[in-house]
C-alpha cells in the first residue's frame, strides 16, 4: 500500500468520512476538517476508491463526492421526483441575490413559497395526490413532503440546518442539480428553465438500497431517479 494512502486510512477522520461518502454525502468547504483531509489526500483516495469501481470527484465548485460506475461495488442512490425538484430550486436560490442579502440563510417557508412560484401547482399536487388540484389538507401534505426532501438533501450535504429554527444554509453542493447550466450565459435563467422544463433521461431500475448518488444531469420518472454520469 502506498505510504500516503496508508496515512490517509490511518487518519482518525477516515472511518466516519468514508461511511458518509459511501452513503452519498457531499463534502463542501463548510465541513472544514473533512474537506481539508480530502484535499490533502485526494490523489491517494482516488486510487483507493477506484478499487471499488467508484470515482472520487472534486467538482468545479470545490466539493467532493463519490460517483459509482456501472460496475461499482458500492450501491447507487435514488431520489424522488420531488427531491430532485427541491434540489433544483435550492440551486436557483443559491444563485439568487437574496442569498447574499440573507447571508445565505433561508427558511423552510421561503423554500416552499419559491417552489410554488417556480412550479405549476398542478404539477406539485400530482406528486402528492396524483391529481392536478388539491385541498388545503393536500397543500399541508405537500409542505411536509418538501420538508422531508429537505431533510434528505441535508443528509447528502446540500444544506446545513441552523438549530431548530426552521432555517438552513445552502452549500455549493447544490450545483449537483445545476451541472448542465454552468456553460456561460445567464445561469440563473438557465436554472429556471431547468426547473420548469426539465432535461431528461428516465431510469426504471430500482437499486436495493440507498447509498451513493450519481449525477443529476437527468430528469426523473414519477417514482425514482438514478443520478447519471456528468457530461
UniProtKB/Swiss-Prot annotation:
This is Chromosome partition protein MukE. Residues 204-231 are annotated as: Disordered. GO terms for cellular component: cytoplasm; nucleoid. Keywords: Cell cycle, Cell division, Chromosome partition, Cytoplasm, DNA condensation. Belongs to the MukE family. Interacts, and probably forms a ternary complex, with MukF and MukB. The complex formation is stimulated by calcium or magnesium. The gene is mukE. Residues 219-231 have a biased composition (Acidic residues). It comes from the Bacteria. It comes from Vibrio cholerae serotype O1 (strain ATCC 39315 / El Tor Inaba N16961). Involved in chromosome condensation, segregation and cell cycle progression. May participate in facilitating chromosome segregation by condensation DNA from both sides of a centrally located replisome during cell division. Probably acts via its interaction with MukB and MukF. Signal peptide: none annotated. Its main location: cytoplasm. It is found in: Cytoplasm, Nucleoid. GO terms for biological process: cell division; chromosome condensation; chromosome segregation; DNA replication. InterPro entries: MukE_C, MukE_N, Scp_MukE. Pfam families: MukE.
Amino acid at each position: 500500500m502506498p505510504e500516503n494512502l496508508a496515512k490517509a486510512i490511518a487518519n482518525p477522520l477516515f472511518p466516519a468520512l468514508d461511511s458518509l461518502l459511501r452513503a452519498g454525502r457531499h463534502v463542501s468547504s463548510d465541513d472544514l476538517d473533512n474537506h481539508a483531509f480530502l484535499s490533502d489526500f485526494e490523489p491517494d483516495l482516488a486510487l483507493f476508491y477506484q478499487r471499488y469501481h467508484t470515482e472520487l470527484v472534486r467538482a468545479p465548485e470545490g466539493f467532493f463526492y463519490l460517483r459509482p460506475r456501472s460496475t461499482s461495488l458500492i450501491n447507487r442512490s435514488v431520489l424522488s421526483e420531488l427531491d430532485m425538484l427541491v434540489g433544483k430550486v435550492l440551486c436557483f436560490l443559491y444563485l439568487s441575490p437574496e442569498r447574499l442579502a440573507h447571508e445565505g440563510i433561508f427558511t423552510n417557508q421561503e423554500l416552499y413559497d419559491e417552489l410554488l412560484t417556480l412550479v405549476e401547482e398542478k404539477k406539485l399536487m400530482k406528486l402528492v395526490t396524483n391529481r392536478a388540484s388539491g385541498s388545503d389538507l393536500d397543500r399541508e401534505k405537500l409542505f411536509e413532503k418538501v420538508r422531508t426532501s429537505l431533510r434528505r438533501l441535508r443528509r447528502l450535504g446540500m444544506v446545513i440546518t441552523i438549530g431548530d429554527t426552521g432555517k438552513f444554509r445552502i452549500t455549493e453542493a447544490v450545483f449537483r442539480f445545476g451541472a448542465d447550466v454552468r456553460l456561460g450565459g445567464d445561469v440563473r435563467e438557465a436554472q429556471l428553465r431547468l426547473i420548469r422544463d426539465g432535461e431528461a433521461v428516465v431510469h426504471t431500475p430500482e437499486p436495493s438500497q440507498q447509498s451513493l448518488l450519481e449525477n443529476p444531469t437527468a430528469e426523473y420518472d414519477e417514482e425514482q431517479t438514478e443520478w447519471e454520469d456528468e457530461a
